[in-house]
């Protein structure tokens, strides 16, 4: 891990801790932007579940729209927006390649989830058409009956993605739009640079 990458990761960690201890209602919420095989972009909000020097992890159904995007076009952009921090909020952007986390990691995280969340992962066919809420409720009841009295295993089609950073951008909001921006970026040889940007 290069010094500048370590610096960017430490900066994120400090800001994330600050957001967790602030009035932010959901500090771990992040927008994940992907593109499908035709290059059509889409974005949605998910929760950050882990991060370290290897990257930033979230979990989902692998056959969901984002899951399919990331398996056919393994690049993503993340966006954290913490409006309550500092003078006028802080925004962090992270861009990078994407890889599946190991089955062991996915198993461990799935086992830590509330039981009803585990059941929901089995009952939901994420991103597919649903005829009615009653249909979903019936699917939930069926899964509950299937696993009654025993642990709920992780579905084969559910797992984690790790975004491996190739760029970080830190935006510190200020009055009169006189913001401060810093960008850390890796080149093709994985050499990191740091520069300040006009707001």
Swiss-Prot record:
Cofactor note: Binds 1 FMN per subunit.
Protein name: Pyridoxine/pyridoxamine 5'-phosphate oxidase
Pathway(s) where this gene product acts: Cofactor metabolism; pyridoxal 5'-phosphate salvage; pyridoxal 5'-phosphate from pyridoxamine 5'-phosphate: step 1/1; Cofactor metabolism; pyridoxal 5'-phosphate salvage; pyridoxal 5'-phosphate from pyridoxine 5'-phosphate: step 1/1
Oligomer and partners: Homodimer.
Organism: Xanthomonas euvesicatoria pv. vesicatoria (strain 85-10) (Xanthomonas campestris pv. vesicatoria)
Taxonomic superkingdom: Bacteria
Function according to Swiss-Prot or TrEMBL: Catalyzes the oxidation of either pyridoxine 5'-phosphate (PNP) or pyridoxamine 5'-phosphate (PMP) into pyridoxal 5'-phosphate (PLP).
Positions with a binding annotation for FMN: 44-49, 59-60, 66, 91, 126-127, 171, 181
Keywords: Flavoprotein, FMN, Oxidoreductase, Pyridoxine biosynthesis
Enzyme Commission code: 1.4.3.5
Gene: pdxH
GO terms for biological process, alphabetical: pyridoxine biosynthetic process
GO molecular function: FMN binding; pyridoxamine phosphate oxidase activity
Pfam families: PNP_phzG_C, PNPOx_N
Cofactor dependency: FMN
Ligand binding (substrate): 49, 109, 113, 117, 177-179
Catalytic activity: pyridoxamine 5'-phosphate + O2 + H2O = pyridoxal 5'-phosphate + H2O2 + NH4(+); pyridoxine 5'-phosphate + O2 = pyridoxal 5'-phosphate + H2O2
Family: Belongs to the pyridoxamine 5'-phosphate oxidase family.
HAMAP family: PdxH (MF_01629)
Entry's transmembrane regions: none
């Amino acid at each position: 891990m290069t010094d500048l990458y370590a610096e960017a990761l430490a900066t994120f960690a400090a800001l994330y801790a600050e957001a967790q201890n602030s009035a932010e209602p959901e500090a771990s919420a992040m927008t994940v932007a992907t593109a499908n095989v035709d290059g059509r972009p889409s974005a949605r909000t998910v929760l950050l579940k882990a991060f370290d020097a290897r990257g930033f992890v979230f979990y989902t159904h692998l056959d969901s729209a984002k899951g399919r995007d990331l398996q056919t076009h393994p690049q993503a952009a993340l966006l954290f927006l913490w409006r309550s921090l500092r003078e006028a909020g802080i925004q962090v952007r992270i861009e990078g390649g994407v890889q599946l986390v190991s089955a062991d990691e996915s198993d461990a995280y799935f086992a830590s989830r509330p039981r009803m969340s585990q059941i929901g992962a089995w009952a939901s066919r994420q991103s597919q058409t649903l005829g009615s809420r009653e249909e979903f409720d019936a699917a939930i009841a069926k899964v509950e009956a299937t696993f009654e009295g025993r642990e709920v295993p992780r579905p084969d089609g559910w797992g984690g993605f790790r975004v491996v950073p190739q760029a970080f951008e830190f935006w510190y909001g200020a009055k009169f739009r006189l913001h401060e921006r810093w960008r850390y970026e890796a080149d093709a040889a994985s050499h990191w640079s740091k520069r300040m940007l006009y707001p």
